[in-house]
């Protein structure tokens, strides 16, 4: 089945797996998904991920989810910019998530990064998702 929003699909798989207290979840691979997973790993929301390459140019990620005292580290993960409604922001209007306790993941001309890194680099871009 074709997926119209691959990033939204990955975020939903993570959300559903954490509700079921799964240790790992698989999702099809792409460069954008890899960059978002890199940010989630750097910020401490997931343990890590591994890539499995298939011969026909396809790949799959296995994401290791993170828990603290039996509860998911990711309390909320939500897609902001969607295929039907893109959301862009300037550097001075980058939204704060949960009063600075969460992060926004932003696709900028300098790459995919967390909101605080985008402010430091003085770049805006497309707000992909927010994590708390």
From Swiss-Prot:
Domain of life: Bacteria
InterPro entries: Ribosomal_uS8, Ribosomal_uS8_CS, Ribosomal_uS8_sf
Gene Ontology biological process terms in this record: translation
GO function term, MF aspect, one: rRNA binding
UniProt keyword terms in alphabetical order: Ribonucleoprotein, Ribosomal protein, RNA-binding, rRNA-binding
GO cellular component: ribonucleoprotein complex; ribosome
Gene3D superfamilies: 3.30.1370.30, 3.30.1490.10
HAMAP family according to UniProt: Ribosomal_uS8_B (MF_01302_B)
Subunit and interaction comment: Part of the 30S ribosomal subunit. Contacts proteins S5 and S12.
Protein name: Small ribosomal subunit protein uS8
Organism the protein comes from: Beijerinckia indica subsp. indica (strain ATCC 9039 / DSM 1715 / NCIMB 8712)
The gene coding this protein: rpsH
């Amino acid at each position: 089945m074709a997926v119209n929003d691959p990033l939204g699909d990955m975020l939903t798989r993570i959300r559903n797996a954490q509700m079921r207290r799964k240790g790992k979840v698989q999702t099809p691979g792409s460069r954008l998904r890899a960059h978002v997973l890199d940010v989630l790993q750097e910020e401490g929301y997931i343990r890590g991920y591994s890539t499995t390459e298939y011969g026909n140019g396809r790949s799959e990620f296995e994401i290791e989810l993170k828990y603290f005292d039996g509860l998911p580290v990711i309390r909320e993960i939500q897609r902001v910019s969607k295929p039907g409604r893109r959301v862009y922001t300037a550097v001075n209007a980058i939204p704060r998530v949960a009063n600075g306790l969460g992060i926004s993941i932003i696709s900028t001309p300098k790459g995919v990064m967390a909101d605080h890194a985008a402010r430091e680099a003085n770049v805006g871009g497309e707000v992909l998702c927010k994590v708390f």
